[in-house]
Amino acid sequence: MFTAFARAFKTPDLRKKLLFTLGIIVIYRLGAHIPAPGVDYSKVQQCIDQADSGGLLGLMQMFSGGALLQITIFALGIMPYITASIILQLLTVVIPRLEALKKEGQSGTAKITQYTRYLTVALAILQGTGLVATARSGALFQNCSVGSQIVADKSIFTTIIMVLTMTAGTPPVMWLGELITDRGIGNGMSIPMFISIAATFPGALWAIKESGKLADGWIEFGTVILIGFVMVALVVFVEQAQRRIPVQLPKRMIGRRSYGGTSTYIPLKVNQAGVIPVIFASSLLYIPALIVQFSNSQAGWATWIQDNFVTGDHPYYIATYFVLIVFFAFFYVAISFNPDEVADNMKKYGGFIPGIRAGRPTAEYLSYVLNRITWPGSLYLGLIALVPTMALAGFGGANQNFPFGGTSILIIVGVGLETVKQIESQLQQRNYEGFLR
């Protein structure tokens, strides 16, 4: 692998792409450390040392590479774009106009991309306003004595400037991602997520060691590393697993030449839904805790939520989280893969699955296979998401932010595999032996 990587750097055009990607990453990380105007950076650092960021806040903190709680110009990171993309993907299923655009090919896709950018800016304004309002009230950091002093000047003018600064930081992140896609290596919208998550690993690992109680925290530290390696191996194995549905294409005569008559396949991944169900479940479970946090209510319902759904080690939380992941896995697969559309396209070009009639029987067969492989895929997602929480709960540290969580591992492995495959294809074009053997 290292020899292949060295050969990649010896190839002029590939080396140029790799160095360009690294340069964009450096710019992105610099922006993630420039504080927004009106923020007392020393107070922020003091509160970060005492912070417990979990749930949706922890998810956004992870996607921003630690920039969210530091309230920097790139504090929102790529999260508004991810949210906008998911919303547009869901709306495409229920709004006929968007569905028609999707079928128009490249021009329709460009229009949907334009809508996604507009929605990204709107969500950035909304999320930036929420972040600044939370920081002004002192609720951004729990149990921090100077939390209300992070934003010293609480005037409307300062608030507007902070919101505009963080909103203005979102389009450059999208632009940097598009530059990576066009002139670099990898998916430009995935690389910032990859770097942001990887940037949180060293600090999170050391925090686990510092908060550990067994052998000065080294046992907890070693356990987390071991669990991380096992999870990475499991995720790589499952993410590569797929059910291949054989498809036979008919032979066509054009002039005197024969075309087609070959066999291909439809790849159905075991984890067809990707990381989306985990994000949905985390976001939904964080809403009750958010309501309690801002209501400051001492009623019975608020106490029950505080006891059962704020920390991740309670059986109610674990069971609900697992059920939500399984539900959203089936839900997202149902809206992202349309067996009827696939069957119609196959019938249009004369393709068929051996032993299955074209048309409706093909769609029913694809639905049957997809439902069968989604079950193990959804259970796998639930396992990956819950193993870190349950492992840390065993050591009494369930409130500690776990660096090898399900979402982070799925994104790290997925983006890593995609990037390595792209480098592999570039090397094979030049007759070099690549990473994958």
Curated annotation (Swiss-Prot):
Membrane topology listed for this record: Multi-pass membrane protein
Key word Transit peptide present: no
Cell location: Cell membrane
Gene3D superfamilies assigned: SecY subunit domain
GO CC field: plasma membrane
Keywords, comma-separated and alphabetical: Cell membrane, Membrane, Protein transport, Translocation, Transmembrane, Transmembrane helix, Transport
InterPro entries tied to this protein: SecY, SecY/SEC61-alpha, SecY_CS, SecY_dom_sf
Biological process annotations from GO: intracellular protein transmembrane transport; protein targeting; protein transport by the Sec complex
Residues that span the membrane, as ranges: 19-39, 68-88, 121-141, 156-176, 188-208, 218-238, 274-294, 317-337, 378-398, 400-420
NCBIfam families: 3a0501s007
HAMAP family reported in the protein's UniProt record: SecY
Record's subunit section: Component of the Sec protein translocase complex. Heterotrimer consisting of SecY, SecE and SecG subunits. The heterotrimers can form oligomers, although 1 heterotrimer is thought to be able to translocate proteins. Interacts with the ribosome. Interacts with SecDF, and other proteins may be involved. Interacts with SecA.
The family this protein is said to belong to: Belongs to the SecY/SEC61-alpha family.
Record's function text: The central subunit of the protein translocation channel SecYEG. Consists of two halves formed by TMs 1-5 and 6-10. These two domains form a lateral gate at the front which open onto the bilayer between TMs 2 and 7, and are clamped together by SecE at the back. The channel is closed by both a pore ring composed of hydrophobic SecY resides and a short helix (helix 2A) on the extracellular side of the membrane which forms a plug. The plug probably moves laterally to allow the channel to open. The ring and the pore may move independently.
Protein name as catalogued: Protein translocase subunit SecY
